[in-house]
Amino acid sequence: IPIKRTMNDTSRELHLIGVAEVHYWHGFDRLIHGLAEYYRTNPEYKVYFHIVGPLSGIREQEEILPAIRDNHLEPYVILHGPLHSDKLDEQFEKADFAIGSLGRHRSGIAHIKTLKNREYAARGLAFTYSENDDDFDSAPYVWKAPADESPVDIMGLVEFQRALTMTPLEIRESVYPLSWKAQMQKVIKEAGFGSLE
């Protein structure tokens, strides 16, 4: 997984990225409703949400597309569709903060360890989510959203991100203990076979 190479200038705008085959449990509609509330105040500071991946079904389309249209968020919510390889990496380079699942409570899940959160950290991005994930809940680069139907507090997210001092490399290094190599080392040691080295 490539690490984010550049720190973008976030003094005037912030670019959020959510990568998924979008289902209702991703709760991206909560972020869009948060953006609607944010933009009602006519802020100078601009926040953009880049959704990478398809909207998986009618339910997701009905939750997301009208929320964008009715709140005139077309300039701020960008639907990229599925992207892979270099095109996906380019979007991650442009991003400043990542969006994990904000609606796992909708499917009755309170605790989950998603691969997406791990990918975001491995790429060196700070991120948000609403479920419980023991590996990240107290990480200094994670801004936890409540596990409910409230619109995401965009100003709170912006303030968190702007106060963040960790570099992409520091974020990536924090997840080394979660890597396959580190996890398999534990298994091999427990089984009494020495080490992977």
Task: Name what the model sees in each region.
Residues 32-39, 68:
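A conserved amphipathic alpha-helix that caps or lines the catalytic cleft of carbohydrate-
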Residues 93-94, 122:
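Flexible glycine/serine/alanine-rich "lid" or loop that lines and gates the nucleotide-sugar donor pocket
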Residues 53, 61-90, 97:
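Nucleotide-activated donor-binding/catalytic signature segment of Leloir-type glycosyltransferases, i.e.
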Residues 26, 86-90, 98-119, 128-139:
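Nucleotide-sugar-dependent
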Residues 7-26, 32-35, 50:
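Conserved donor-binding/catalytic core segment of Leloir-type glycosyltransferases
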Residues 5, 149-197:
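A charged, aromatic-enriched C-terminal amphipathic alpha-helix characteristic of glycosyltransferases
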